[in-house]
Amino acid sequence: MLNNAMSVVILAAGKGTRMYSDLPKVLHTLAGKAMVQHVIDAANELGAAHVHLVYGHGGDLLKQALKDDNLNWVLQAEQLGTGHAMQQAAPFFADDEDILMLYGDVPLISVETLQRLRDAKPQGGIGLLTVKLDDPTGYGRITRENGKVTGIVEHKDATDEQRQIQEINTGILIANGADMKRWLAKLTNNNAQGEYYITDIIALAYQEGREIVAVHPQRLSEVEGVNNRLQLSRLERVYQSEQAEKLLLAGVMLRDPARFDLRGTLAHGRDIEIDTNVIIEGNVTLGHRVKIGTGCVIKNSVIGDDCEISPYTIVEDANLAAACTIGPFARLRPGAELLEGAHVGNFVEMKKARLGKGSKAGHLTYLGDAEIGDNVNIGAGTITCNYDGANKFKTIIGDDVFVGSDTQLVAPVTVGKGATIAAGTTVTRNVGENALAISRVPQTQKEGWRRPVKKK
């Protein structure tokens, strides 16, 4: 159906006392992203014209964390209930738009469920998201007459009979802006909590003869809120289980779905194998037939076809062409690039460095601010000395170079194509093509040498 223009209000003013944290509750992360950011992203994907964020506790931290989002910041100086929070945002509502109310601590609400709620909202009425629980203790109950929603009664205000009702309010609703403002103006705090309940607008709408349509979410986890770290950890596992299931059904082999974390987005080819305790962060792309060993962390990187990443390797903001092998215990930092067939072995670190086709850095090496050609061998213990204490400098190594073990290349320096660097050499000047560079001191040998002994 054709929807009206819509704006979203996200309530995020709570202190989150039970989190026992100096960080505002809604900034605690789920799948590597602040809870409230999940909700903002859903609102934007839904096509919200404006997103009004009602805040109170930790406003400066919220504004810093969400500075890249186009938000209208609405201060709720005193936390006097959900109705009071909406009253603070009401001056920004247009009469001819729909207003969708969401919560910053309900992070798993889906765009699909919200779209169904939006579609179900009757003209002049309210769309209400509800669920049925076996144990509804503590939640507002949905009251009905002849099947029609008549109101919401908070648990503390409910009679014994009303507390037997299993259908409860999730707090998520949508209504017309003009209607919302009129109903908000009529709210009172005549209840056990002494607060202004947004739920009271349901009874006000019913009294006006307006229709209230209840919609259920696809999954209960979509409407579960977070008040403490235990609840947050449980939602994290729910989310990760759902993501793992999607990947398995799409052909990705997760050796143990319960020990895999996706904290971003994963684009992938066919025949991917991912071992246990792997973490994917940010935006990651895996080509066909990629294998990732246990304990790896891959963040904001592109991994080409037929690459193999051995256990306990960290890859961040890096690009690997086809058929590269890295690890175990390797670290690719931002700006690392491996061309086709390159190899980075154990205890090798790369940063802002390119390793050419078929080139190898087998072990115990640091390559920073370096450009390394094709078919280069980097011996164990090689270090590009790129920093003089104030500035960074570049090392350039041409094709077909052999770098012996325990070599230091003091940048800025260039090693020409086909050159050989002898083991133990400190390179401080450019090396010409096909030349041998060696800077070791001559070896001396003392016959019959006796080791020192400890004094008694």
Swiss-Prot record:
This is Bifunctional protein GlmU. The gene is glmU. GO terms for cellular component: cytoplasm; membrane. It is found in: Cytoplasm. Its main location: cytoplasm. InterPro entries: Bifunctional_GlmU (IPR005882), GlmU-like (IPR050065), GlmU_C_LbH (IPR038009), Hexapep (IPR001451), Hexapep_transf_CS (IPR018357), MobA-like_NTP_Trfase (IPR025877), Nucleotide-diphossugar_trans (IPR029044), Trimer_LpxA-like_sf (IPR011004). Catalyzes the last two sequential reactions in the de novo biosynthetic pathway for UDP-N-acetylglucosamine (UDP-GlcNAc). The C-terminal domain catalyzes the transfer of acetyl group from acetyl coenzyme A to glucosamine-1-phosphate (GlcN-1-P) to produce N-acetylglucosamine-1-phosphate (GlcNAc-1-P), which is converted into UDP-GlcNAc by the transfer of uridine 5-monophosphate (from uridine 5-triphosphate), a reaction catalyzed by the N-terminal domain. It catalyses: alpha-D-glucosamine 1-phosphate + acetyl-CoA = N-acetyl-alpha-D-glucosamine 1-phosphate + CoA + H(+); N-acetyl-alpha-D-glucosamine 1-phosphate + UTP + H(+) = UDP-N-acetyl-alpha-D-glucosamine + diphosphate. Its cofactor is Mg(2+). Binds 1 Mg(2+) ion per subunit. It comes from Escherichia coli O8 (strain IAI1). Residues 251-456 are annotated as: N-acetyltransferase. Pathway: Nucleotide-sugar biosynthesis; UDP-N-acetyl-alpha-D-glucosamine biosynthesis; N-acetyl-alpha-D-glucosamine 1-phosphate from alpha-D-glucosamine 6-phosphate (route II): step 2/2; Nucleotide-sugar biosynthesis; UDP-N-acetyl-alpha-D-glucosamine biosynthesis; UDP-N-acetyl-alpha-D-glucosamine from N-acetyl-alpha-D-glucosamine 1-phosphate: step 1/1; Bacterial outer membrane biogenesis; LPS lipid A biosynthesis. Keywords: Acyltransferase, Cell shape, Cell wall biogenesis/degradation, Cytoplasm, Magnesium, Metal-binding, Multifunctional enzyme, Nucleotidyltransferase, Peptidoglycan synthesis, Repeat, Transferase.
